[in-house]
């Protein structure tokens, strides 16, 4: 997907939604087995010649119980990481949804919302800065897609989509009702000029995170990684059980 975005510059709204539906469906399959990917990004989304989308590279994925979440020092790619990952906090399905929203933003605009000279700079932007609406960059972005992206990328997990099923419903509706106002508003989206004040201890935690700095590798390198589906999950469980 990363190469495809580079080739086209940016994707149409319809193509973005169609790819996103397949991407989120793959995530939903993982989440249904209590697997959190933790490194969703276009480099890990493979588009086959027949247009099928696969979520790949579960290298830092973690299994949870139905009531358990993850708190760990392992970090995915900083340009797509959620605020809670950046600060080393609790990670669950909503963290993957944030990363999916960043990937949608890149499909629509042709670039990631936050960039900087270092991984720490980018991580702090995920924590402090509000994402500028894709409509500012691409005025013909449908209202429904804009709202979906902004809801996915809320700073607080409680105001994002709570699961992939909710997100899929809105993505499918956006295909047939691009300008619809059906997306529930969560909290008021902060003005883009607002910043969140971080104390020195929180900044220090971000600076000590273990980021994957290779954000723009050739996605062909992921072709041999394990794709996620129910069969591969069952095979992996049998291997682990001996």
Where are these regions (language model features)?
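AlphaC helix of the protein kinase catalytic domain
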Residues: 2-11
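Structural helix C-cap motif within protein kinase domains
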Residues: 109-113, 156
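Conserved HRD-motif arginine in the catalytic loop of eukaryotic-like protein kinases
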Residues: 160
